[in-house]
Regions:
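Nucleotide/pyrophosphate-binding catalytic subdomain
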Residues: 1-132
Length: 132
């Protein structure tokens, strides 16, 4: 069976143009099948600020109400995702941008409230991950 590399990048890479460029060049050079997982929290916060949507955090974790969910969906699945796809395409790396919701790739359920209700924050259902 062919190897599949799953690599996640965080804000330190996304928020640094030079680091992102270097990472994506290295990622594009991987000849095996690969999946890139990314966030975009700081970008979402900056855009939210411009749109008048306040970012709320408790203990460093984002509180995701309905409006914030719309914002992060736009930023992660749209803006950041498509920027990364465009850069990879420019590096002759065929890339397709999808989210966990696309094709029912990942299912999750709302995280139970313990001490703090983080809103629309969920936990991935391991049995619900489409590995095909």
């Amino acid at each position: 069976m062919e190897k599949l590399f799953v690599i996640k990048i965080g804000g330190n890479v996304l928020d640094n143009d030079a680091a992102l460029s270097a990472f994506l060049r290295a990622f594009a050079s991987i000849s095996e099948r690969k999946i890139l997982i990314h966030g975009g929290g700081k970008i979402a916060s900056r855009l939210g600020e411009r749109l008048g949507i306040e970012s709320k955090y408790i203990n460093g974790r984002r509180i995701t109400d309905a409006l914030t969910l719309d914002l992060v969906t736009m930023v992660y699945g749209g803006l950041v995702n498509k920027q990364i796809v465009a850069i990879l395409q420019s590096l002759s790396c065929d890339a397709l941008g999808v989210t966990g919701a696309d094709g029912n790739l990942i299912s999750a359920k709302k995280r139970p409230v313990k001490d703090i209700d983080y809103g629309f924050v969920g936990d991935i259902n391991p049995e619900g991950v489409n590995r095909d």
